[in-house]
Amino acid sequence: MSNKHPLVQVIENAQLIERPSFAPGDTVVVQVKVREGERERLQAFEGVVIAKRNRGLNSAFTVRKISSGVGVERAFQLHSPIIDSIEVKRRGAVRRAKLYYLRERSGKSARIREKLAPRAPKVVKAKTDARVPDAVETAPGI
């Protein structure tokens, strides 16, 4: 429950940007707008989401990747205008909300299992006792 003034809530809700849903353990590619002088380009930051904070306009998430053997973490504001897009590469199966323990791990011990897609429900065919005739007769004149 928020204790914010209703007018503040309206203004904050107007600034929310639609983003894909993701969770800690997911591997994401964040396209970040980078200014170099007068030029603006997109820079991809791909890594594992180790933390996510859901607070409306103040929502944030942290992405960790290994670059040249060195761990690099970057925190992003979810609704920030410098984020061009977020693409979820793979879903990770984890049992924690914060994956800070990955900071001490490297190599195979830092791997995260992939979440399997949910199974489709089995379709059971109903047995019918009525037999379907081989040839259906039509009334003359039709």
From Swiss-Prot:
Key words of the record: Ribonucleoprotein, Ribosomal protein
Keyword Metal-binding included in the entry's annotation: no
Family matches, as InterPro entries: Ribosomal_bL19, Ribosomal_bL19_CS, Ribosomal_bL19_sf, Translation_prot_SH3-like_sf
Stored Pfam families: Ribosomal_L19
GO cellular component assignments: cytosolic large ribosomal subunit
GO BP: any one term: translation
GO function term, MF aspect, one: structural constituent of ribosome
Keyword Nucleus: no
Domain of life of the source: Bacteria
Family named by the database record: Belongs to the bacterial ribosomal protein bL19 family.
NCBIfam families: rplS_bact (TIGR01024)
Record function comment: This protein is located at the 30S-50S ribosomal subunit interface and may play a role in the structure and function of the aminoacyl-tRNA binding site.
Protein name: Large ribosomal subunit protein bL19
Organism: Psychrobacter cryohalolentis (strain ATCC BAA-1226 / DSM 17306 / VKM B-2378 / K5)
